[in-house]
Amino acid sequence: ESGLKGLSAWKRVVDNRVYEIQQKNNIELYKDSELSLSHINELGVDNIFLATGSSWRVDGVGRSSREPIKGLDKITVLSPEDAIKNINKLESPIVIYDDEQGYLAGVLADHLSANGCNINFVTPASVVSPWTDSTLEQARVQRALLKQGVEIICNKTIANGEGQSLVTQCVFTGNKTTIDCKTIIMVTERIPNCSL
């Protein structure tokens, strides 16, 4: 995420925190090291803190729906990480579905549209990235997307896919409309990585 527009300072924060931890004599840090229960037992230490991380869901489960979105078999479905890694392979029309309603979907739409992608931004919220209202950035984020030509579709969930189209549904009336889509980027919910 720190490679996205406006988020470069985040990497410095992470680097600083890792540096601070590494300065402690009573802490050993094993980055990017998967551990099994037997590995943990071999370490023979009393206290272990595991930061296992999480992964973005790609099935559409989020705030508005606890059920996966059906009918997406003819559409390329990506996580935010996959979209960033494969930016040159994304097929338009692209839909970013923001049912997390934090900051990432807006930043991702900004990044992809600045790199020439045609983006439709669909969200059940009444504005883009409503959480950014807490940081007084919401209006700036939405204005930037509109200036870049991002099509913003608010107050709509994605009911299902149909071929290379998505059926959206108004959160108030239930009315349905169809939009073309070859690639959907799901910014809906993260699943914790809990396995050892």
Task: Annotate each language-model stretch with its function.
Residues 1, 30-41, 48-133, 172-183, ...:
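Rossmann-like dinucleotide/flavin-binding elements
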Residues 30-43, 154-165:
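A conserved short coil-to-beta-strand element within the FAD-binding core of flavoproteins
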Residues 151, 159, 177-179:
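Residues that recognize and position ribonucleotide moieties
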Residues 166-170:
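SH3/SH3-like beta-barrel fold
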